[in-house]
Regions:
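C-terminal helicase module of SF1/SF2 nucleic-acid helicases/translocases
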Residues: 104, 111-212
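C-terminal or late-domain output modules
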Residues: 77-78, 82, 87-99, 142-158, ...
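C-terminal accessory/interaction regions of large nucleic acid-associated machines
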Residues: 8, 168-180, 219-442
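Beta-edge loop/turn motif
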Residues: 42-79, 103
């Protein structure tokens, strides 16, 4: 290993709590590359593969393979389908996704030509001179490398939203999000941000002679937005709803919860985490809406039915893990905390799958966003005299602190000023304690 790789390997071991929990080992001739891996693990895998005397093979998942920029001689695409995380079923890859993955073979400045082998799913069998590949497979291969790729068919996503609204699909997640994002809009020609009638969807409707139908759909959208606006009188809430995509009514309830807490507000990031979890446990709509993207992971971690809605019991199970994350505990300890809370016994922690889901999915894709909304609501939705009772430095640090895994804004600042690229969260906590014991930090 190079010096940089050794530092990355030390960071990986510190973050996980030992080498036995990692997907990698320094002697690997083949390395994985997937979303369950820590950032430092992926960096190490890429570095090992990049070296001519390093790993010979890198095995990447479908999505991540499209982003790898490594000098591969041969790209083997093990199937043209992938698992859908939401439905749990297999789905076909689009032609451009296969092309992106195939483009990993060869790299400008390193290897002009590369070889790509696509293994279809399911496997095909045919005999020379007797059978021929199915026509749909030939069509897919031709679509991957078209004769003329200069022209693209483009469409306006707004057109899809308007069609769903015209069909009264008001509970569709995309429709709800669009209406929320327009919470502070006025559907006037003078609209400073964006005039829907001058959108690409509007242009296409005019060209196709469907202007009246398009205008009718816009009127339905306008009426839905205005109906939401009539329920909220605080323009600051409407603005935040527009910025975040969260329903203004939900933000209003969160605002009242914050006001109720002003008498004895949380005094640490850990107390803010517990405060937020108590709110999510008590508010079914907030829990369902704000945790929708990570609901499957939360339920998987808690050992409950994966497709069920997030419930208070599931949040109680992951809470110790979140507190352990910000306290600087390694993932093996966080895994044990989650298992203990879920009352699950196991002989081996394996690769700490539950803790990895918490660190790689639930925290960055769910909790970080929610804490960002809390910070914005405190700064923009509470009167100035109310803000004076709160530690605003801590409020501003809530989202990045939970994302990076620190329990104070001071540690967050310490981590951002440290120049060590490979340093992990656990190592930073240890360095902070060391500096404090030496009297270098008050």
């Amino acid at each position: 290993m190079t010096d940089v790789e050794l530092r990355l390997w030390e960071a990986v071991q510190a973050e996980l709590g030992g080498p036995e929990y990692s997907f990698l080992s320094p002697e690997n001739v083949a390395v994985p590359h997937n979303s369950a891996m820590l950032r430092q693990e992926r960096q190490l895998a890429e570095s090992m593969f990049r070296r001519t005397d390093g790993a010979d093979v890198i095995v990447a998942t479908t999505t991540l393979a499209q982003g790898l920029n490594l000098p591969a001689h041969l790209a083997i695409l093990a199937g043209d389908m992938r698992a859908n995380a939401k439905t749990g079923e297999r789905e076909k890859l689009a032609a451009h996704e296969i092309l992106n993955a195939a483009a990993r073979a060869g790299r400008a400045g390193h290897l002009a030509n590369g070889l790509v082998l696509l293994i279809p799913e399911p496997l095909l069998s045919f005999k020379d001179g007797k059978d021929s590949p199915p026509a749909d497979l030939i069509k897919k291969l031709e679509s991957i490398l078209p004769n003329d790729d200069k022209c693209l068919n483009i469409s306006d996503p707004l057109e899809i939203i308007l069609d769903k609204i015209s069909q009264a699909h008001w509970n569709n997640a995309d429709v709800i999000y669009t209406i929320n994002r327009m919470s502070d809009w006025t559907f006037e020609p003078s609209q400073p941000l964006f005039n829907i009638k001058k959108s690409f969807a509007g242009y296409c409707a005019a060209v196709q002679g469907l202007q009246q139908e398009f205008d009718r759909k816009v009127e339905l959208l306008s009426a839905a937005v205005e109906e939401r606006q009539e329920l909220i009188f605080d323009h600051k809430l409407l603005t935040l709803a527009s910025q975040s995509g969260i329903p203004a009514q939900l933000l209003a309830r969160l605002q009242m919860r914050l006001i109720d807490a002003l008498g004895s507000p949380p005094s640490s990031i850990h107390e803010w985490i517990q405060w937020l979890f108590e709110w999510l446990m008590s508010d079914n709509e907030a829990r369902t809406y704000l945790l929708a993207e990570v609901a499957r992971d939360i339920m998987t971690i808690s050992g409950q039915e994966k497709e069920a809605s997030v419930n208070p019991a599931a949040l109680k199970i992951i809470l110790p893990g979140v507190l352990g994350w910000t306290s600087g505990h390694p993932l093996c300890t966080i895994e044990q905390q989650i298992l203990s809370a879920a009352q699950i016994t196991t002989k081996s922690l394996g690769t700490c799958d539950r803790a990895r889901k918490l660190a790689n999915s639930i925290i960055p894709r769910g909790l970080t966003f929610i804490f960002g909304v809390v910070s914005q609501l405190v700064k923009n939705g509470l009167p100035s005299e109310a803000q004076n009772t709160l530690d605003l430095k801590m409020i501003e640090a809530l989202s990045p602190a939970i994302r990076q895994g620190y329990d104070s804004w001071e540690k967050l600042a310490f981590a951002s000023t440290d120049g060590s690229v490979a340093l992990s969260r656990v190592q930073t906590h240890a360095k902070w304690k060391e500096a404090k014991d030496m009297g270098l930090i008050d």
